[in-house]
Amino acid sequence: MASRKDTLVRRASRVRRQIKAVANGRPRLSVHRSSKNIYAQIIDDVAGKTIAAASTLEADLKSALKTGADTAAATAVGKLLAERASKAGVKDVVFDRGAFIYHGRVKALAEAAREGGLNF
């Protein structure tokens, strides 16, 4: 029986393989969540550069939020990331949820980024 870590690594690689097949040069919106925080970044895989990033560890978000581990925090990160992406000139991205299911905080971040103007 595979360990939990092995299962997560296999799931993340499966998701990334699907993303590479449909990306067509679009940057990737990568999401990582821990038990206390959520992080998101837009990565240009062709150039190997991070275009925009946001997380609940940033001082302005950290002071405004009660905790970094709820859907309100994920929504704030999604809106901030969409704002930074539009300043950088990025509109179309591919959503990379990694090994995390599209539910709860990951879904809240994605919906807030869509409302902020990102297309995926």
From Swiss-Prot:
The keyword Flavoprotein does not apply. Keywords: Ribonucleoprotein, Ribosomal protein, RNA-binding, rRNA-binding. Pfam families: Ribosomal_L18p. One of its GO terms (cellular component) is cytosolic large ribosomal subunit. PANTHER family: 39S RIBOSOMAL PROTEIN L18, MITOCHONDRIAL, LARGE RIBOSOMAL SUBUNIT PROTEIN UL18M. Part of the 50S ribosomal subunit; part of the 5S rRNA/L5/L18/L25 subcomplex. Contacts the 5S and 23S rRNAs. Belongs to the universal ribosomal protein uL18 family. This is Large ribosomal subunit protein uL18. The lineage of its organism: Bacteria, Pseudomonadati, Pseudomonadota, Alphaproteobacteria, Hyphomicrobiales. The gene is rplR.
